[in-house]
Amino acid sequence: MTLAAIGQICSTASIKGNLEQCVRLVGKAARGGAKVLFLPEASDYIATDAQASLDLAVAQSSSPFVLGLQEAAKTNGVAIHVGIHHRPVPAQVPDEKEDSKATAAGRILNRAIYIAADGRIDDSNTYDKLHVFDYGSLRESATVQPGSRLTAPFDSPVGRIGSLICFDLRFPEASLSLAQPGPPSRWHGRPAQLLTYPSAFTLRTGEAHWETLLRARAIETQSWVVAAAQVGRHNPKRASYGRSIAVDPWGKVAVRLKGVTDAEGSAEEGAVEEIGFFDVDLDEVDRVRREMPLLRRIDVYSEV
């Protein structure tokens, strides 16, 4: 078993302040003995409106937030999985379809990155959110260009990670595609053992669906599911549900953090910059998949 940590913050428009929150969590994770720390979606910033979000976005390679987390990972010897915003620079990456599409549309990318314990980032492990969130007054599509591909599961100290982000949670096809064995040609026969959903759920959708959906994804994929969440009020217009959670392949909650206390988005005492620890047992993944094989009838319905 390997010890992992999950942390939650309350991002604002202050990138410097958000980095400071995250760096403190990296230190807590290291002192607790964790090998990997999972942080929420949009950890770099949550702006007050669409234009402000576009104005704050920079390229991942020059982001002071990302550079600061790389240094924190290296200093503390802890790998970090985190959600950020990325402004494409097409001249530097002419072959990246997501970058080209986003630039043409004047939009940015909602991205999950993995920073190794030595501070390095392997771009092949980067994932751009496929399903953007348009609900109520929130219109993510106004600023975010959807990604166009899944990222192959990649190795980490806590197993092979399959990256997804927040609203992707409502589309089980994505998690099934990452985690089910399938033909040898899929992921070279190396499906995900742990799925991530860095998130910033609204209060209404969080109360109704958050834990139910996450446990369902864990049960149907027979994988670990880790969802680090934003918590509390970011600005007068927006608040997040919190309750970061890790679920084992049998659907049992391994750790659950605090959340909001009321309809105004007030965070429980200690919820902001809270961290939780859990042991990732990859033998449990193998055992559950072996004892309850999910033999899909693709002769009757289409394979995902």
Question: Where do the protein language model's features map onto the residues?
Answer:
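Extreme N-terminal starter segment of soluble prokaryotic enzymes
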Residues: 1-5
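Active-site catalytic loop in hydrolytic enzyme cores
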Residues: 58-60, 71, 88-190, 198, ...
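C-terminal beta-strand edge segments of enzyme domains
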Residues: 224, 230-304
